Amino acid sequence: MARIDASKLETTEKVVFINRVAKVVKGGRRFSFSALMVVGDGNGHVGAGLGKAGEVPEAIRKGIEDAKKNMIKVPLAGTTIPHEVIGEFGAGKVLLKPAAPGTGVIAGGPVRAILELAGVRDILTKSLGSNNANNMVRATIEALKSLKTPEEVARLRGKPVEELLG
């Protein structure tokens, strides 16, 4: 899959989760932060990244950089996705179902952030496994990566699109 050049896209960033971690040293605790970020153009391109630093703004900046490096193309069918899909990452499991126009994005926290920035307007989702933000984000990205348009499936099977849909 060709890499997506994020610099050519009008992207929007969203903070999904900021975590403070402590390293215990002889003189006390050393705090650092990790920021889970999602970047998207609202038109089928989305990416997620994790940034770690001693300060929150720096962690966010690094997270955005990482997210832009890991962007994927999401095949959209109008305002929804082409078919139902389950994405898994670690113990995180996310079910994505296409929905009729006007339904809206029915999703919780981390999954909602990704879908909105990807440009999906109508979708039903359900978190089936761990609710850890990092695993949910990565599971959603895996699910979106595995989506295929009817044209792609027809080409892979060597059949006309009408035969698949009809």
UniProtKB/Swiss-Prot annotation:
InterPro entries: Ribosomal_Su5_D2-typ_SF (IPR020568), Ribosomal_uS5 (IPR000851), Ribosomal_uS5_bac-type (IPR005712), Ribosomal_uS5_C (IPR005324), Ribosomal_uS5_N (IPR013810), Ribosomal_uS5_N_CS (IPR018192), Ribsml_uS5_D2-typ_fold_subgr (IPR014721). GO terms for biological process: translation. The keyword Ribonucleoprotein applies. It comes from the Bacteria. Residues 11-74 form the S5 DRBM domain. Keywords: Ribonucleoprotein, Ribosomal protein, RNA-binding, rRNA-binding. Signal peptide: none annotated. One of its GO terms (cellular component) is small ribosomal subunit. GO terms for molecular function: rRNA binding; structural constituent of ribosome. Belongs to the universal ribosomal protein uS5 family. Part of the 30S ribosomal subunit. Contacts proteins S4 and S8. PANTHER family: MITOCHONDRIAL RIBOSOMAL PROTEIN S5. With S4 and S12 plays an important role in translational accuracy. The N-terminal domain interacts with the head of the 30S subunit; the C-terminal domain interacts with the body and contacts protein S4. The interaction surface between S4 and S5 is involved in control of translational fidelity. This is Small ribosomal subunit protein uS5. It comes from Pelotomaculum thermopropionicum (strain DSM 13744 / JCM 10971 / SI).
